[in-house]
């Protein structure tokens, strides 16, 4: 297991996922911190940052660009002012929601991006997110 000096890391299971702390991803990050986040992503496949504020699209873009070029999803061209970002909202009374059933966000692309960033503002009590991977050791 890698030693992290700038970030804190809490593994969430023996197979996948870790929570990263001691970093404000809305701020400009030193290369060493970005490197440790990249390493944690490679090691744990899915990483989580709690209590962050990416409500400013510029902050969200900057953080995303640490990991590569921004991806414009071909299935979510919603005419929004930030085509690199997909805003999914559900208001009281709405009966349909994107992503309610099993789906893959980007892995079906011929040249998929290295990952995706989800910034959840509010998750309903019944809401859950499942990440899967076929990279686990046997």
Please annotate each region the language model reported:
Residues 2-129:
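Non-heme Fe(II)-dependent double-stranded beta-helix
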């Amino acid at each position: 297991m890698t030693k992290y000096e700038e970030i804190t890391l809490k593994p969430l299971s023996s197979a996948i996922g870790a929570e990263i702390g001691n970093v404000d991803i809305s701020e400009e990050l030193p290369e060493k911190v970005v490197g440790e986040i990249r390493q944690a992503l490679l090691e744990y496949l899915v990483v989580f940052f709690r209590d962050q504020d990416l409500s400013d699209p510029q902050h969200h873009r900057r953080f995303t660009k640490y990991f590569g070029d921004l991806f414009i999803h071909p299935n979510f061209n919603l005419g929004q002012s930030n085509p690199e970002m997909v805003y999914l909202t559900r208001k009281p009374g709405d009966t349909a929601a994107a992503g309610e059933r099993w789906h893959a966000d980007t892995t079906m692309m011929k040249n998929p991006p290295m990952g995706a960033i989800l910034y959840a503002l509010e998750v309903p009590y019944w809401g859950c997110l499942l990440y899967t991977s076929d990279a686990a050791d046997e």
